[in-house]
Amino acid sequence: MKTYNIYEYLPKRFFTVNPQYTATRRLVYAFKDGKKWATKYVADVVVNLLTKWYGEKASDFVLVCAPCASQKKYNYRFLKFAADVTRRAHIQNGSAYVNIFGRRESKHNNALHVVSESFGYMVNLDADFFKGKKVIIFDDLITSGATAEEFKEQLDNVGATVLGGLFLAKTVHNDGIRGAYKEIKYKQYSA
């Protein structure tokens, strides 16, 4: 699946002197928490991108936000965002046709620890709505891409054609002191 990320997200466990990484962290956390300023900012950026890429043809496509841990979190994080983006970009809104049952714990993956537990977690898609539609998936973060690929497969199974994924940020990794040295060397930060 083709993917496009707006920003690069460096997890807190990595040191950085780059103010852009710090600002992106704040934006991602605020968006995930449903903060109005972050939701509005991200909606503005996404509307501008979709309008630039598709213009008047945007109405031929469906924007659907990827499922998150629970229906409550999905509604809180994405429903107003999706309604605003789709109204302003003149693209169809598929987020109201995603239902999440149960809950999935957050995925925390690193070399030493993997957590991904589900408790009756199931995502249900309205096949009548998605059948034959050209879909763009939106999510806040992409790390490995596994969650987006799983969701793409579910959409494919109900007859949708997924054109790609649009992400607020892609997780990148820094390598400690050498990473800070590279940031200074390439003038991402000046002392």
Q: What spans do the regions from the language model cover?
A:
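Short glycine-rich phosphate-binding loop at a beta-alpha junction
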Residues: 58-69
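Charged helix-capping and loop-helix junction motifs
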Residues: 77-83
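Hydrophobic alpha-helical packing residues
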Residues: 85-89, 155-156
